[in-house]
């Protein structure tokens, strides 16, 4: 039986939240002790690496900020959208690492900003539209590749974990369907 998509995406998201990210200290801060975990001390301007969930809390507290390359923003989304549009159906480009978890968080942040400042609503709506375009473009490519003969690892290496899971499920389903349709059996067998 196929593994539910929500379990796969949840698993990828769990791994992302616990993956190491880089951040820069905004100010000096002594060592912080949590249950079984010590973080810091932090010196203003220095770069540190912590699990994403800790970095997120440090950012909320104003102690640190994410490095620019750790973030996904509207400008990066537009570049990705452009890249997806100019490529052929048989080729899928490499997305930034942890693209979908970062995308979900980017959209959540924009939505929260829009709820507090109505002038941000337009940016949120544009980002949402661009995101939908990226997802639809990649989905078309995944479906096309999944219905073609098996792909080489070279082709599949640009898939994200979420996309590879979808590709494998679709490929298996399409292959089984084709086999059933094209199977030559006598009536009544």
PLM region spans:
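Compact, well-ordered interaction domains used in eukaryotic information-processing assemblies
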Residues: 29-72
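N-terminal, Lys/Arg-enriched amphipathic/low-complexity engagement segments
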Residues: 1-31, 35
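Generic structural hydrophobic/aromatic packing signal, biased to beta-strands
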Residues: 23-25, 50, 66, 103, ...
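Short N-terminal secondary-structure initiator segments
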Residues: 17-19, 44-45, 51, 88-92
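Charge/polar-rich, low-complexity and marginally structured segments
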Residues: 2-13, 71-189
């Amino acid at each position: 039986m196929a593994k539910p998509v929500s379990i796969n995406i949840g698993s990828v998201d769990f791994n992302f939240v616990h993956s190491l990210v880089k951040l820069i200290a905004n100010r000096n801060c002594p060592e912080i002790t949590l249950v079984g975990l010590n973080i810091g001390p932090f010196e203003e301007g220095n770069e540190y690496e912590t699990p994403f969930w800790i970095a997120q809390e440090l950012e909320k507290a104003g102690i640190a900020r994410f490095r620019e390359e750790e973030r996904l923003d509207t400008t990066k989304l537009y570049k990705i959208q452009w890249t997806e549009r100019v490529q052929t159906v048989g080729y899928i480009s490499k997305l930034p690492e942890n693209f979908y978890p970062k995308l979900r968080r980017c959209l959540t942040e924009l939505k929260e900003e829009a709820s507090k400042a109505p002038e941000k609503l337009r940016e949120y709506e544009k980002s949402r539209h661009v995101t939908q375009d990226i997802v639809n473009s990649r989905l078309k490519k995944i479906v096309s590749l999944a219905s073609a003969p098996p792909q080489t690892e070279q082709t599949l290496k640009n898939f994200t974990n979420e996309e590879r899971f979808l590709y494998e499920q679709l490929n298996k389903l399409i292959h089984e369907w084709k086999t059933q349709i094209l199977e030559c059996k006598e009536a009544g067998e």
